[in-house]
Amino acid sequence: GHLNSLDTVLEIGAGSGNLTEKLARKAGKVIAIEVDPELASSLNKFDNVEVITGDAMKQDFPHFNKVISNLPYSISSPVTFKLLGNKFDMGILMYQHEFAKRMVAMPGSKDYGRLSIAVQYRANVEIMEIVPRLAFSAPPQVDSAIVRLVPRMAPYKVNDVDFFMKFITAAFSQRRKKLKNAILNNAA
């Protein structure tokens, strides 16, 4: 995934700008979203960086064709689905390793569930690299993983995507109960 001057890269949770700086050198434009106003103001030092100060979940994302982010883990799931509601070519995203394993899980594996189905319905997804917690200067409590996400046409047609997502949520939330009950309780 090489960047060039034609790329507009979205970065969510830009923080102090370590990644932003690297992206700004290679991409035509970087859109950096950062919730902390102090950190956000320090991102203005690059000519080709548009800074959006605020909560990524409350912002409309401007047009971008790539997203490269060290996502805040607390919003991994909602931000991923918000991203997948936009048109873009490719994402390189850092997640908690456990979350990443669920994203890429195959049917029948213990990590397979609603997240796997919902993400894989909208994108090809693969873990590129595991990042051990000790690789960070202030180590988090968990290992991380770098995931490549490539949106594509859905592999099968669902007439009502909202219902489909509710349905798989119901099915997986009550995995141990009989599926029939789960469906009756949640689909009505």
Placement of each model-derived feature along the sequence:
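Catalytic cores of RNA-modifying enzymes
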Residues: 1-166
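Arg/Lys-rich, often Gly-containing low-complexity segments of ribosomal proteins
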Residues: 176
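Short, intrinsically disordered, charge-balanced linker/junction segments flanking boundaries
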Residues: 185-188
